Amino acid sequence: MMEFLKDFQKMGIYLAYNVNVDAIVYLNEKHIESLIKEFGAENIKKRIDEYPREINEPLDFVARLIHALKTGKPQAVPLVSYEADKWFNSRFKYDFERIGGQVGVIANLLANLDFNKVIAYSPLLGRKQAEMFVNRDNLLYPVVENGKLVLKKPLEAYREDDPVKINRIFEFRAGTKFKLGDETIEVPYSGRFIVACRFEDFARIETSPELKPYLPEIGEMVDGAILSGYQGLRRYYSDGKDANYYLRKAKEDIKLLKKKKDIKIHVEFASIQDRELRKKVIYNIFPLVDSVGMDEAEIAHILSVLGYRELSDRIFTYNRIEDAVLGAKILLDELNLEILQVHTIYYLMYITHNDNPLTEEELTKSLEVGTTLAAARAFLGDIKRPEDVKVGLNIPFNEKGEYVKLRFEEAKAKMRTREYKIVIIPTRLVRNPVSTVGLGDTISAGAFASYLSLLKRKE
């Protein structure tokens, strides 16, 4: 692990597109009981059955929150109503606020790990967001001045009039108990429920026209790029533009980043509720990039779009490793990826083709970087310096580790894997995490960065 930290000091990464502020509430029994009393158990149960896919009113939020607590699975649901947005501000006192969005989380992480250069871009950069980036010389925001590309600290580059996106995050703990009518519910796993702000101002995934011509120059400065935020896209916009317009722009960005130097590009995929939008992102973006990261639920969502409904349903219903491996093989081949990274509560997986220059042992080391960083973040709440990583090394692999390895070996024996390199490792699991927000992003960033460093060693 520590040898990777030395490599990171010589590496540069470009990040785009989504930065926001996370307003975090640590849920307890009183919060939950108060919401149930306010909205009524029967009303909540009825709305849970309707399963709203976006939050138009507070009852939609309460229903989806209770559903997340019952399953213990992390969920994110888009907030689309300005009235509901005001209700959250009047109803909840936030425990604290910090930078969010994949770009925000990953930028601060990599800067604190002493990467040589972290270039973080978001189409909007308000003052509050700029203040939440760590104030370090290696974390920079690209601007154009006098016809030249200039890299500035975010605090020197923000725009006073840019709106700030706020996501509300409700952290819940395993073992929390509450009553919903006659039903007693105990939360099975720690996790978080995200109310993801999806207003139109924040749904434009693009590089500014001024900066766009300089993307090839940025590509030359870095070893790789991590792109995210596509989950914010809308089908249609009030000015007549649509998702296809922004996806065309996003494809241009990828090609420009690779124009002068064929850098590796990773996409961190987040849940897209709208099936048609999900399909558009998958078919437009994935074939142009090298690496994609996701969890097993997102594998199932994508398989459904690709026409593998039965396998998708099996992953949702049974959560078996063998189904996840089969699904990952399909995604790797159908979407022309170099490598697919899967992160779940109990295991991490890489799948790539047999001609990948890295050995299975090296791929395993890369995944271990991801889970070690995530464990350190879960235990400490944040990683503020390279030495914090040692905390993660002292956290044991989860108790299902041996079972995970056994099921993986059984899965490999049953299916054709000769053309692939597939590695799975158990996760290091913190029993009472300070926070679960950003752990998937931390895993993906750590794994992708270490993957790049291992490839560089082969050059």
Curated annotation (Swiss-Prot):
GO terms for molecular function: ADP-specific phosphofructokinase activity; magnesium ion binding; phosphofructokinase activity. Binds 1 Mg(2+) ion per subunit. Its cofactor is Mg(2+). Its EC number is 2.7.1.146. It is an enzyme of class 2 (transferase). Gene3D superfamilies: 3.30.1110.20, 3.40.1190.20. Keywords: Cytoplasm, Glycolysis, Kinase, Magnesium, Metal-binding, Transferase. GO terms for cellular component: cytoplasm. Pathway: Carbohydrate degradation; glycolysis. Its main location: cytoplasm. One of its GO terms (biological process) is fructose metabolic process. It is found in: Cytoplasm. Residues 1-457 form the ADPK domain. Pfam families: ADP_PFK_GK. Mg(2+) binds at E268, E298, D441. It catalyses: beta-D-fructose 6-phosphate + ADP = beta-D-fructose 1,6-bisphosphate + AMP + H(+). HAMAP family: ADP_PFKinase. Belongs to the carbohydrate kinase PfkC family. Catalyzes the phosphorylation of fructose 6-phosphate to fructose 1,6-bisphosphate using ADP as the phosphate donor. This is ADP-specific phosphofructokinase.
